[in-house]
């Protein structure tokens, strides 16, 4: 039986690979997509998501979400993904439009209609998820779990300690981590290992139409290089859904620092139980890299 999922995303070049996997992995049933400001503005992430849906000719409802963090000024990662968020490929024009309601309400409505609890997957800042949990707490029983790409048990990637998706809206992340829902965190501890090799990247143009598109995007992606390998951060959240045995997880208490002058956005992961608080997150700490790479190759071979 396919696993029903909703995907909250901020495309983003590596988001494009994660979206492809979410759509075409046979074990998954992607029923709703929502966008959030993150890698670039929400107008651009929405445009990029709609372009991808049109590229693959799939009809999945998509709702535009939060344009700004809960309480602070927005930040982006255009230096990594390009000003458009998906620089490097010329998508054809289309007339697709997002749903006419905010993302968190679209998630609420879809959860309440679903015949069984749904897995939420968030691969951008957690603003939409925080709005859902704070404004619609009645939805919690309908959430099977939340799988996120974000955070770190060690170093960061946009500050010395903070990972971008959490640092972009620390207050939202803190709200989500305090919510009591089941959370799986695929942070930099595993995503920095999730590298596609130069040899594999070189095969993409001959793989299929999607391979050509991704190869063009990857040539503009700044999370590594085509010569040294590229990190597939967001794809780890999708991989865990279908190949959890590739990941080493540990239940930990995790809090989000929202006040520190140098540490704002840090996920404080109590690996050794020093704080004596009950675990609230399953934290991914290690990855079977070869198994991950093999899975990616299998999935992308299925994509048209």
Swiss-Prot record:
SUPFAM superfamilies: Nucleoside hydrolase
GO BP annotations listed: purine nucleobase metabolic process; purine nucleoside catabolic process; pyrimidine nucleobase metabolic process
GO cellular component, one term: cytosol
A GO molecular-function annotation: uridine nucleosidase activity
One of the Pfam families matching this protein, by short name: IU_nuc_hydro
Superkingdom as given in the UniProt entry: Bacteria
EC supergroup of this enzyme: hydrolase
Keywords annotated in UniProt: Glycosidase, Hydrolase
Entry EC number(s): 3.2.-.-
PROSITE patterns: IUNH (PS01247)
InterPro entries noted in UniProt: I/U_nuclsd_hydro_CS, Inosine/uridine_hydrolase_dom, IUNH, Nucleosid_hydro_RihC_nonspecif, Ribo_hydro-like
Active site residues according to the UniProt entry: 233
NCBIfam families membership: PRK10768.1 (NF008036)
Similarity comment: family membership: Belongs to the IUNH family. RihC subfamily.
Role summary: Hydrolyzes both purine and pyrimidine ribonucleosides with a broad-substrate specificity.
Protein name per its UniProtKB record: Non-specific ribonucleoside hydrolase RihC
Source species of the chain: Escherichia coli O6:K15:H31 (strain 536 / UPEC)
């Amino acid at each position: 039986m396919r696993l029903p999922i909703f995907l909250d995303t901020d495309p983003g070049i590596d988001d494009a690979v994660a979206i492809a996997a979410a759509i075409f992995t046979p074990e998954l049933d992607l029923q709703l997509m929502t966008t959030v400001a993150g890698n670039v503005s929400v107008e651009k992430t929405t445009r990029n998501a709609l372009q991808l849906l049109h590229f693959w000719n799939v009809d999945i409802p998509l709702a535009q979400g939060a344009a700004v963090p809960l309480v602070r000024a927005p930040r982006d990662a255009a230096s990594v993904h390009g000003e458009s968020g998906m620089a490097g490929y010329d998508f054809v024009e289309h007339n697709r439009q997002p749903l006419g309601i905010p993302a968190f309400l679209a998630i609420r409505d879809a959860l309440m209609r679903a015949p069984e609890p749904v897995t939420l997957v968030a691969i951008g800042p957690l603003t939409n998820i925080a709005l859902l949990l704070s404004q619609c707490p009645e939805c919690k029983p309908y959430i099977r779990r939340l799988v996120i790409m974000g955070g770190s048990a060690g170093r960061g990637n946009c500050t010395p300690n903070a990972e971008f998706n959490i640092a972009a809206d620390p207050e939202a992340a803190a709200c989500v981590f305090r919510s009591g829902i089941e959370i799986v965190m695929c942070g930099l501890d595993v995503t920095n290992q999730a590298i596609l090799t130069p040899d594999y990247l070189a095969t993409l143009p001959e793989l299929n139409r999607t391979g050509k598109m991704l190869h063009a995007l990857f040539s503009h992606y700044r999370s590594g290089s085509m010569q040294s390998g590229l990190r597939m951060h967001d794809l780890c959240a999708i991989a865990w859904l279908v190949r959890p045995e590739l990941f080493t997880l540990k239940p930990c208490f995790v809090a989000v620092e929202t006040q520190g002058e140098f540490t704002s956005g840090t996920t404080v992961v109590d690996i050794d139980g020093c704080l004596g608080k009950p675990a609230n997150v399953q934290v991914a700490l290690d990855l079977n890299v070869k198994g991950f790479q093999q899975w990616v190759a299998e999935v992308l071979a299925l994509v048209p």
